[in-house]
């Protein structure tokens, strides 16, 4: 097994280009060896501008863009397509078109229609700037390329998603192309990967945990579907009262979804037939709906009206809403989630595509997978827990996930205190109300966060935790002295761990001297950091991206930390599929990205953000 830097090549297709350009870095270690690190990122570019996107009806709000007309190539995110044009005067007295004409660059704007809307962009430095859409080029991702040209996206698959054997072969070609460097006394690089031991690491493998579900049954990771046979570790402690919301004219689809959920959860039925592998009483659900409400598609006002109507009904535990496919910014998803979160009502969205699977008897086999995930989503959003870890290594009482959400220039929100006990059982999450300046979490908010952590643990166990592990996603370091004083005054041992997902390093594995992809659980580590594979690549293209796990302080052994991270990555509540991140930082990140959908200022065990 070896540390490894990425490598690739490129393809061109008319207006879209896919580049995989290697960059190199030389690092000289204490052993006087020079190590070549090759880092390659897939880069996509296009001749299309934001103006072309608007003309084709492609949504642009939220896209990352670069100013192609500027000397410094400013970059940022599209905030708004304005309701005024490039020919209308702005605050500084002239229009954007006049601005370029006065600069002597009329050739850039002379063919742009006066009706072209202005684009408002928040730059990466926080500035709020208005642009002509023709000046802006989107920063393309693989996902966007797929939407622009699905065929091209498939054709570049082999170049973008490569297994480790292919990656190393391409790197060897690249090293041979470098050859001997005459200016450095004919220095050349070896083509074999160096052993991790030369870099100060040891190699190992973390075995998957055993999970405990209903009836104290133990199941293996990869067989989570058995939870429907044995029941959940903890189901909601009441009979759920549900409200239903659906677009006008889709009552048949809504009925199909509702009947499937109700009969599956209460009777163990699937498509009106008793399933011998599904137990009765998975979740207790009230037979009659609290409210059934229609809404008109394409009318934001009607979305809010329907959501507010449900909001006024007392006692609803969860809303099941049928919504259009996709995440259109003008669709009902955001208004529904935001309004219901304000009054502490979780919701489970079901797409029309999924609903049609339940309506179509021929799709019954396909619909079962979706039903599993819908039921798990309802479970997690109403306080239930499908499974926990049987045995967690390390003498730890609870785990806490921290993250920071950026909402506007210079303003950050700590979305923290996702707290789990030593078995990975959710005790609750806490989203503070206060916004803060800068990425350094204010002392007052830290106090609030960890007070809530301690209160949640005490409420469950009747005593203060003795040992806490804090996971965070690499944001700026907080006041180390504060942690020392806070936990020291309470006699609590603490360990802080950074879990980083965006790294360029890879792992490779040798089987009979052949290079293959690393497997789930493969890792390398030293005293204070490790690289860990948390992704199962079976039947998938490409190679897994490991996590970088760094211990910042504390006494928990690095081998135990890696095992804890892997175990926590196997405990996602809302699906039988696994997440790459542990649920500590993974769920904290989800709160950040869905901040407006989550109640604030209170500890809660309902996973609104799933």
Where do the language-model regions lie?
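Long, contiguous domain-sized segments
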Residues: 1-83, 276-278, 282, 291-316, ...
């Amino acid at each position: 097994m070896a540390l490894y830097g990425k490598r690739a090549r490129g393809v061109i297709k008319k207006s879209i280009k896919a580049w995989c350009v290697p960059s190199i870095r030389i690092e000289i270690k204490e052993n006087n060896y020079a190590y070549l690190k090759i880092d390659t990122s897939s880069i996509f570019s296009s001749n299309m501008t934001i103006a072309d996107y608007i003309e084709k009806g492609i949504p642009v709000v939220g896209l990352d863009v670069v100013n192609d007309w500027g000397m410094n190539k400013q970059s940022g995110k599209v905030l708004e397509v304005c309701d005024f044009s490039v020919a209308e005067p702005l605050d500084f007295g002239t229009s954007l078109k006049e601005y370029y004409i006065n600069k002597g660059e009329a050739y850039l704007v002379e063919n742009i229609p006066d009706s072209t809307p202005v684009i408002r962009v928040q730059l990466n430095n926080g500035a709020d700037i208005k642009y002509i859409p023709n000046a802006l080029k989107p920063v393309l991702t693989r996902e966007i390329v797929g939407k622009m040209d699905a065929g091209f996206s498939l054709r570049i698959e082999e170049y973008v998603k490569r297994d480790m054997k292919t990656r190393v072969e391409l790197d060897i070609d690249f090293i041979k192309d470098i050859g001997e460097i005459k200016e450095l006394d004919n220095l050349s690089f070896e083509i074999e990967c160096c052993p991790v031991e030369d870099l100060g690491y040891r190699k190992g493998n973390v075995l998957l945990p055993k999970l405990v579900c209903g009836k104290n049954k133990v199941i293996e990771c990869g067989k989570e579907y058995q939870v429907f046979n044995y029941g959940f570790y903890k189901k909601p402690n009441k009979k759920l009262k549900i409200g239903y919301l659906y677009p006008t004219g889709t009552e048949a689809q809504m009925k199909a979804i509702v009947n499937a959920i109700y009969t599956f959860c209460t009777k163990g039925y699937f498509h009106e037939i008793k399933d011998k592998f599904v137990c009765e009483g998975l979740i207790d659900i009230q037979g009659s709906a609290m409210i059934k409400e229609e809404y008109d598609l394409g009318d934001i006002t009607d979305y809010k009206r329907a959501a507010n109507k449900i909001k006024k009904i007392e006692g609803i535990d969860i809303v099941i809403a049928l919504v259009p496919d996709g995440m259109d910014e003008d669709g009902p998803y955001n208004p529904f989630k935001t309004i219901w979160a304000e009054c502490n009502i979780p919701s489970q969205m079901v797409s029309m595509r999924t609903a049609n699977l339940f309506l179509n008897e021929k799709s019954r086999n396909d619909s079962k997978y979706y039903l599993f995930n819908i039921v798990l989503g309802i479970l997690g959003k109403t306080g239930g827990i499908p499974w926990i870890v049987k045995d967690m290594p390390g003498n730890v009482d609870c785990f806490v996930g921290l993250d920071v959400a950026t909402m506007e220039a210079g303003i950050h929100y700590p979305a923290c205190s996702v707290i789990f006990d030593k078995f990975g059982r959710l005790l609750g999450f806490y989203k503070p109300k206060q916004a803060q300046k800068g990425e350094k979490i204010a002392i007052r908010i830290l106090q609030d966060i960890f007070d809530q952590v301690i209160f949640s643990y005490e409420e469950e166990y009747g005593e203060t935790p003795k040992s806490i592990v804090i996971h965070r996603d690499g944001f700026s370091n907080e006041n180390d002295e504060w942690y020392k004083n806070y936990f020291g005054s309470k006699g609590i041992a603490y360990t802080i761990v950074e879990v980083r997902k965006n790294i360029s390093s890879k792992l490779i594995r040798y089987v009979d001297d052949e290079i293959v992809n690393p497997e789930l659980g493969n890792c390398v580590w030293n005293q204070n950091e490790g690289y860990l594979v948390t992704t199962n690549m079976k039947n998938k293209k490409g190679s897994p991206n490991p996590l970088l796990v760094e211990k910042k302080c504390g006494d928990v052994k690095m081998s135990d930390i890696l095992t804890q991270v892997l175990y926590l990555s196997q405990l996602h509540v809302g699906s039988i599929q696994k997440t790459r991140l542990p649920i500590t930082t993974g769920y904290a990140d989800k709160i950040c990205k869905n901040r407006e959908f989550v109640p604030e200022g209170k500890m809660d065990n309902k996973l609104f953000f799933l």
